Amino acid sequence: MNWILDTPLFVRLAGLFLLGIWLGGFLNLGIYRLAYQQRSISPWSAALPGARPRRITDRLPLVGWFGLRRESALHGAGFWVRPLALELLTGALIAALYWWEVGERGLLPDQLRQFLDLPGNLGLALAALATIHIEFCAHACLLAFMIVASFIDLDEKTIPDGVTIPGTLIGLLLAAAAPQSLVPVAEFARGPNGLGLASPRLSFLTFVDRADWNWGSELSLVLGIGCLWLWCVGLMTRVWRLRRGWRTAMRLFCARLMRDPMTKWLVILGVLGTLALVFVHHHLGGAHWQGLLTALVGMAIGGGLTWVVRIVATAILGREAMGFGDVTLMAMIGAFLGWQPCLVIFFLAPFGAVAIGIAQGITHRDPEIRYGPFLCLAALVTIVRWAEIWEKTAPLFALGWLIPATLAICLLLMGPLLIIVRGISNRLRGE
C-alpha cells in the first residue's frame, strides 16, 4: 500500500486511465459476444467471412479501430465510433472514480475527512485509505458489469444472464472475502461526559445498520440461504399459462422447468452456495458473515422489489413493463452495495426514465424504455454521492419494521398511478 501512496496522484490517474481504456476493449468484446445477436465487431473476435484477417495492431486500444474502418462495408458506416468512444469513456470513468473515492475521499463525510487530516491520525488515515482502495476496486468491477449490461440493453432491449449471474457471484464473493468492499459507514462516539469526539469508527454498511432488528446467528443463516435460493429459483425458466386451467398450467410449468438444462445448473449452484454460506457462517463468521449476509439481502431486496413492480406494472399496463433482465441487474447491484442503496437507486432511476418515456410518447417513437441504463446511472450516482445520501437517509433506515410496511404501501399506491400514466400515454398517442 505504501508504494501506491508514494506514487503521485496524477501518475496513478494516468495509469488507471490507460488501464481503463484497455479494459474498455474487453467490455466491447463482452457487449458483442454476450448479446443475443452476436456480432464480430470486436478485434478480439474472428473476422467475418470475406473480411481481411485481423491484425495484431487492430487489437491496440483506440488506434486499432482506425484500422478496422476497412470493415465498414460489413458492419455499417461509422460502426467503429461507438466502441472507440466506449474505450475512452471507460478509461475516463475509472480514473474519475479513483480521483473521487481515493484522491478526494468523496465517500467519507466531511467531518471524518477533517478528523483524519489532524496531526497524529496518520495511522487511522492510512487504514482508511486501504479500505477506500478496496471499495474502489469493487465499484470499478461493478461499473464494468453495468457498462456491458447497459449497452446490450440499448442494443437489444434485454440484459443477458451471462452478464448478471457472474456479476452477482463476484459481488457476493467480494462481500465475503473483503467486507470493506461494501459502501462505507462512519460513526462518531462521544467522549467522556458527552464532551468531544472519540476516534471515529470507519466500517461498512451492514444488513441491520441503523435498523433495530434483532437477528440471531442461526436465524441469519436461514435468511441468507433463503435469499440465495430466491435468486436461484428466480433465474429458472418459468412458463405459466392459465388458458386451460390451473392443473394444466402447473403441469406445463413443471415440465418446462424440468426440460430446461439451466434448471440443473441452478440447483447445483444453490446447493454449492448453501454449503459455502454454512462454511462462512460457522468458520469465518464476524465481519465476513456480516458482509456476505448484507450482500445476499441486498441481492434479494434489489431483485425482489424490481420483480414485484414488474409483475404489478405488467398486469395494469397490459404489456411487459420491464424485462426480467432489469430484475437480475438490480440483484447484481444489490450484491455489491447492499439493500439500503438499492432502495435509493430504485427511487432515483424513474426520474430519468419518466422524462425519456414522455418524450418518446410525444414524438410517437418506440414506447418501450430501456430501463437498465437508468438503473445503472442511478447506481453510479448513489455510489458517488453516498456520503450525502447516507447522511440524509440514515434516520429513515432506522425505522426498522416500518420500512417494509412503507414499501408495501408504496406498491399499493403504484397501481392507481400506473393507471393514470397509461391514460396519459394513450392520450398522447391519440388512442
Predicted segments — roles?
Residues M1-E431:
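A membrane-topology feature that recognizes alpha-helical transmembrane segments
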